[in-house]
């Protein structure tokens, strides 16, 4: 843990970040920077007004308070020089990465072929041919049918990931032919998120961003409320995250009214 008395001291911040990068403990590094909200604007500095009332009307005051030039969109020469050099460093790093990636592809052709399949999904018609058909009068819980459907789909989509908020035993979306993703098995396709619906949905967003994996996650429908902010960001970002919500009946009984999703579907605007 590092504590910076002046969180506005950019040199001190950079020094702390570089120190954290060099840490060998293998543990997360925390930097606590003491700052003043709205610094440089006397009318709002150090008050809650600094959050939403800063606005353009204080721009000139802020420039003077922070000793910045009056010029709009001003970029100092040291910043220009730094980023020009940074661009060169990025190009060198990318060149090294391309060589390493080419060597990896040559050494692991099977894994490279799997990576190339990212984003190349089978058609819906093809997947429909693989999933089981159920009699119309089958006395089968929807989640049990979902369990039987996800297995062949997971075979056809080797980059599909299935997670649950500590409810795999109830949501039944576990990929039976695979194992858990964990420290000693990074190839596992089942993620155990714990009772953390928001974290589950947010992590699924992160997994989806690079377009390689197709994440799915599951919990009871009533707990969609906990994951809704992350779901909203997924919609805004057009991320193809799959949400599986079971126990969707208002007749869910043994857990009582806290688990009955009376208004949840309307809230999700499904």
Please annotate each region the language model reported.
Residues 3, 80-81, 85-270:
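Thiamine diphosphate
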Residues 1-85, 256, 261-265, 269-270:
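Glycine-rich ThDP/TPP pyrophosphate-binding loop and its adjacent helix/strand module
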């Amino acid at each position: 843990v590092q504590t910076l008395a002046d969180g506005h001291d950019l040199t001190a911040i950079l020094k702390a970040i570089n120190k954290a990068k060099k840490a060998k403990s293998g543990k997360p590094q925390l930097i606590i920077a003491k700052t003043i909200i709205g610094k440089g604007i006397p009318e709002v500095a150090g008050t809650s007004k600094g959050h939403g009332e800063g606005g353009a009307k204080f721009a000139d005051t802020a420039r003077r308070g922070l000793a910045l030039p009056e010029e709009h969109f001003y970029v100092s020469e040291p910043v220009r020089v730094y980023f020009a050099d940074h661009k060169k460093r990025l190009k060198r790093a990318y060149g090294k990465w391309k060589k390493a990636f080419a060597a990896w592809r040559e050494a692991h052709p099977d894994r490279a072929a799997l990576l190339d399949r990212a984003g190349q999904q089978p058609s819906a018609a093809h997947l429909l041919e693989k999933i089981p058909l159920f009699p119309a009068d089958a006395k089968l819980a929807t989640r049990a049918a979902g369990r039987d459907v996800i297995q062949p789909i997971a075979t056809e989509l080797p980059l599909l990931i299935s997670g649950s908020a500590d409810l795999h035993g109830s949501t039944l979306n576990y990929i039976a032919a695979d194992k858990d993703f964990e420290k000693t098995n990074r190839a596992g396709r089942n993620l155990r998120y714990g009772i953390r619906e928001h974290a589950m949905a947010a992590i699924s967003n992160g997994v989806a961003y690079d377009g390689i994996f197709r994440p799915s996650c599951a919990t009871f429908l009533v707990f969609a409320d906990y994951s809704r902010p992350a779901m909203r960001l997924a919609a805004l970002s057009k991320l193809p995250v799959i949400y599986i919500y079971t126990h969707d009946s208002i007749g869910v009984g043994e857990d009582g009214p806290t688990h009955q999703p009376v208004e949840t579907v309307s809230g999700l605007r499904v």
